[in-house]
C-alpha cells in the first residue's frame, strides 16, 4: 500500500511538472510604443530595446518566431528593458527627446537603422548606445541583452564579456 501511494505521488509529480514548465516557458515580450516606453522610463528608468523591422522582412519574421518567442529572452527583456517594436515604413509619429518625428526618420537618422532587422539599444534617457544590424538567434541576443541590461558595457569590453559569459537561452 505504501508503495502504491509513493507511486501515485511520484506520478502526480511527473504529471504536474510539465504543466509548470510549459507555463514558465510561455512568457512573451511585452512590446510597447516608443512614447509609452519614454513615459514609463521617467518613473522607472531602464534601457530601451528596440526591434526595427518591416512587414516584408523575412529575417525579421524569423526573429519573431525563433528569438523573441524564446522564454528566457522574453523574460530577460521584460525585466531589464522597455521593449519597443518600430516599423520605419509606418507613418506613425513618435517623440524622440521631445521632438516629433516619424518612425522612419527616427530609425534612419537617429538610430542608424537602414537595414532590417536592426536591434537598437538606448539608455533610459534616450541616449543611443548601439544599433546592431542583422538577425540574432536566441543565444546571441541573450548574450547581448545581458551585456547591456546589467551595465557590463560600462566596465568591460564586449570581447572580454563574450569570452566569460556562459549562460544560454536554452
Can you name each region flagged by the protein language model?
Residues 54-59, 67, 88-92, 126-127:
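Solvent-exposed loop/turn segments at secondary-structure junctions
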Residues 60-78:
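Typically the conserved alpha-helix immediately C-terminal to a functionally engaged Cys/Sec
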Residues 1-23:
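Bacterial Sec-dependent N-terminal signal peptides
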Residues 30-47, 77:
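A short beta-strand-turn-helix
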Residues 80, 86-114:
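Structural alpha/beta surface segment adjacent to cysteine/selenocysteine redox centers
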Residues 152-170:
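Flexible coil segments in periplasmic/lumen-exposed cytochrome c-class electron-transfer proteins
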Residues 43-58, 83:
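Short active-site neighborhood of thiol/selenol oxidoreductases, capturing the structured segment around
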Residues 109-154:
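Non-catalytic, surface beta->alpha helical segment in thiol-disulfide oxidoreductase systems
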